Amino acid sequence: MRIPNLKDLLEEGVSGRCVLVRCDLNVPLGDDGAITDLGRVTASVPTLKALLEAGAKIVVAAHLGRPKNGPDPKLSLEPVAAALGEQLGQNVQLVCSTDRSPVGGDALACVERLTDGDLLLLQNIRFDPRETSKVDDERLALAKQLVELVGSAGAFVSDGFGVVHRRQASVYDVATLLPHYAGILVADEIRILEQLTSSAKRPYAVVLGGSKVSDKLGVIESLATKADSIVLGGGMCFTFLAAQGFSVGKSLLETEMIETCRSLLDTYADVLRLPMDIVVTEKFVADSPPQTVAADAIPDGLMGLDIGPESVKRFATLLSNASTIFWNGPMGVFEFPAYAAGTRGVAEAIVAVTGKGAFSVVGGGDSAAAMRALSLPEGSVSHLSTGGGASLEYLEGKTLPGIEVLGREQPRGGDS
């Protein structure tokens, strides 16, 4: 299917038109409420700038966190509005409606005052429980209010790749009502992930980490037939080690997944690669003393928090021969300096082979956060995705509601 994109919309003309843009501005916040990683704000800028320069009036919908029972001051988009305004070089008005919903009467009045080249950010769209409702009519009602904001001549641009796997009002339902287009970010993500699934240059190496096998099972099964090797690290590797009959001490373990892991190891023995040594400790705290042990000899009473140095060397050698690499999930608890070496080593190996011409994609979420936490430049890999869950579901071959709807026939506008 062909998905209309921002270029199509700009060719139609947006000067004087109101455009609703769904961005992913779900940034991490520190204890003081300050943004600790601006990656998603920065990624939203190209689409917004293109529309502003073309004279559009922009209404941005976005969320922050998972508010329960309505508005939560701790999850206000106020710091996001300030950061976005700084990056765009212009004022970004945050609409704080007196209604419980971000699309209440105040929002409509603010939109009516917009002039060409203005941008307005709605308050956290998830403050309205209809955004994430499982009831179609409830989501559709909110979508219709969003359409009312931009009017019958308006358009919808989907540029929040991190939420396209969600069937939510501002992601899916609004696209059934307005002419819809993929923003620059979403179009790029689709193009790159499609390359990983259908035309990846071999050898193709996949690096998977994170805590749970259950979170990565689908992508392991999907990519095991496409990749030449799949490196497994992070907390999920201990369930695979247990499936081989090894003791894993107090390490993270999904006992209900052991048989599944055993089956995967039997079926894809020539593809799956496990660590040979593990950095273990007694307690899950940053200053708990580390020691390195063989992966098949983790002592009782100790837990693994990182892959060991021999594993890093082995994985780095494997990656050095790859032409295509996809990485999702850290190799250990990189937030603890004593247990960050595995993630750093693998990341540096990916950066090195990228510098020699390999095509590398780093999945969103913790992997992207690790790159930044370890002070590795974003430009040192070919593509740093903004969507963790969305990237994985796409690679699994699942239908992503927010992408599927963009490929549908265009509605006639806000009155359809």
Swiss-Prot record:
One of its GO terms (molecular function) is ATP binding. Keywords: ATP-binding, Cytoplasm, Glycolysis, Kinase, Nucleotide-binding, Transferase. Belongs to the phosphoglycerate kinase family. HAMAP family: Phosphoglyc_kinase (MF_00145). This is Phosphoglycerate kinase. It catalyses: (2R)-3-phosphoglycerate + ATP = (2R)-3-phospho-glyceroyl phosphate + ADP. Substrate binds at residues 24-26, 40, 63-66, 126, 166. The keyword GTP-binding does not apply. Signal peptide: none annotated. It comes from Mycobacterium leprae (strain TN). Its main location: cytoplasm. GO terms for biological process: gluconeogenesis; glycolytic process. CDD domains: Phosphoglycerate_kinase. GO terms for cellular component: cytosol. It is an enzyme of class 2 (transferase). Transmembrane segments: none annotated. Monomer. It is found in: Cytoplasm. It comes from the Bacteria. Pathway: Carbohydrate degradation; glycolysis; pyruvate from D-glyceraldehyde 3-phosphate: step 2/5. ATP binds at residues 216, 304, 335, 364-367. Its EC number is 2.7.2.3.
